[in-house]
C-alpha cells in the first residue's frame, strides 16, 4: 500500500523463527503472558502499546513466538475486541483531528489535500479489511462515524 513513498522505509527486520529465542529466560509461562495481555487490555492499552510494554518491561520480544498466538488473537479469545482494526482506528483519529483543524482554518489548502490523501488511505484499508473479513461487507467510513468511534475508544 505504498502510494506516497518512492523509497523504502527503514525498519528492523523481524527474526524468522517459530519458537522463542534461545536467549529468552522467562519467569512466566505462555498462559501467564496471555493473562498479562488481557489485564493490560482491560486497563485500556491498545495492542501495539501492550506489545511495547511486554517488550520493554517484561523482556518478551514477540508475543507470537512465546505463546504461539498473535496478540490480537489472544484478545479476541478473551472477548476483547476493538470495533475496527488498530491501524484503521489511528488513521481515523488522524482524520478527525484534521477535520477539526480545517473547521478552524478553512483556507489551509495543504491540510485539505492531506485530508483527501488520508481518507483515500482509509478507503483502501477498509476495502482490504472487507476483503479479508475483518470488517463486515456493509461497513462504510463516514467522518461522523469516525468521530464517534474515535471518541469512544481513544
Curated annotation (Swiss-Prot):
GO CC terms: cytosolic small ribosomal subunit
The keyword Nucleotide-binding is assigned to this record: no
Pfam families linked: Ribosomal_S13_N, Ribosomal_S15
Organism superkingdom: Archaea
Annotated spans, Disordered: 1-23
Keywords carried by this UniProt record: Ribonucleoprotein, Ribosomal protein
Family listed: Belongs to the universal ribosomal protein uS15 family.
GO molecular function, a single term: small ribosomal subunit rRNA binding
Name of protein: Small ribosomal subunit protein uS15
GO biological process: translation
Alphabetical list of InterPro entries matching this protein: Ribosomal_uS15, Ribosomal_uS15_arc_euk, Ribosomal_uS15_N, uS15_NS1_RNA-bd_sf
SUPFAM superfamilies, A to Z: S15/NS1 RNA-binding domain
Subunit (UniProt): Part of the 30S ribosomal subunit.
Amino acid at each position: 500500500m505504498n502510494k506516497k513513498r518512492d523509497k523504502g522505509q527503514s525498519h528492523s527486520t523481524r527474526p524468522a523463527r517459530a519458537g522463542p529465542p534461545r536467549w529468552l529466560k522467562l519467569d512466566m509461562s505462555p498462559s501467564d503472558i496471555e493473562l498479562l495481555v488481557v489485564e493490560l487490555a482491560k486497563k485500556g492499552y491498545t495492542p501495539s502499546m501492550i506489545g511495547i510494554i511486554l517488550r520493554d518491561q517484561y523482556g518478551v520480544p514477540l508475543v507470537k513466538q512465546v505463546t504461539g498466538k498473535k496478540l490480537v488473537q489472544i484478545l479476541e479469545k478473551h472477548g476483547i475486541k476493538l470495533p475496527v482494526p488498530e491501524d484503521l482506528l489511528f488513521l481515523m483519529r488522524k482524520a478527525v483531528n484534521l477535520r477539526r483543524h480545517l473547521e478552524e482554518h478553512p483556507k489551509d489548502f495543504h491540510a485539505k489535500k492531506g485530508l483527501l490523501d488520508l481518507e483515500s488511505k482509509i478507503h483502501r484499508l477498509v476495502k482490504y479489511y472487507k476483503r479479508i473479513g475483518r470488517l463486515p461487507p456493509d461497513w462504510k467510513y463516514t467522518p461522523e462515524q469516525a468521530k464517534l468511534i474515535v471518541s469512544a475508544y481513544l
